[in-house]
């Protein structure tokens, strides 16, 4: 039985997901997510949300072996797209044909720095309020992560069938994310 290109791709993605999960070690596996996308004639972002257990350090393992066309970018924030004051916690560009990990400890440091800077710039609060806000910042945790995959613009391809009918060729890609936490 010959496999369809779609079936072949699904088998391949399963292998990539397994590699992604292995890269989490010694962290405890918590879940994985395959995000499929189609290249369009404009840049756009796909956002996925990950919930975290508050006091744990998480490792995020990415596998972009199924990003077969233009490389994508990854940006991780503390809040969803609709918030203007969200903080960029992690960024990676030129993501394609690679496997890599990042951890939330580094992201929390960035979040604390951004919040401390904002507090320092705020001049119209009392000393009591300022010291209260400093304590909040010291103990800040990430409850959720908002991962944005930025898919770049790609020229549309066209194909012509035997009857001379033209149709668009959809260029697709996938990125895999596995998440694990340090369970000590």
Predicted features and spans:
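Non-catalytic extracellular/lumenal accessory regions of secreted precursors
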Residues: 1-47, 183-184
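Acidic, Ser/Thr/Pro-rich low-complexity intrinsically disordered segments
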Residues: 4, 39-184
